[in-house]
């Protein structure tokens, strides 16, 4: 399942649970996260850190000496079913300003509808563009200057997502990239287009 620190995955069509890495879409979660323009962000991923370390043990050195028990990475993104929203999620500057948000907190900090999410399934297909660990495979050239501050968690290709949620990055060809701060104080999420 590993290729130079990568763990490729697809999605299971099975009942999710709170201990799984989940990707989906929920706009009705508790403790709303708000963009600078007042728009409520959508919860698009839930990553329990202990589960991440089980699936991708290469992260253990990054989390060494960190308190991560019962913590999760929450990924929020600008989403609008009725209107164009791609510009809000493709610029790193917009992500830094809060049009997307990564929060590391208690596993129960946000109550959300778990049935709107799909658990990941680690696989051995090395051609998949959705994976945990390793280095990001950008669709467009991206400056790595900002990477020193972050740990790359993984990337998700829209077309790998189940049909019900495959437009959370606006187009299925788009890829979302998840990073966390090295001190676990938050992170960065943005999308690239082809």
Segments the model singles out, each with a brief description of its role:
Residues 1-194:
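Preference for intrinsically disordered or flexible, low-complexity segments
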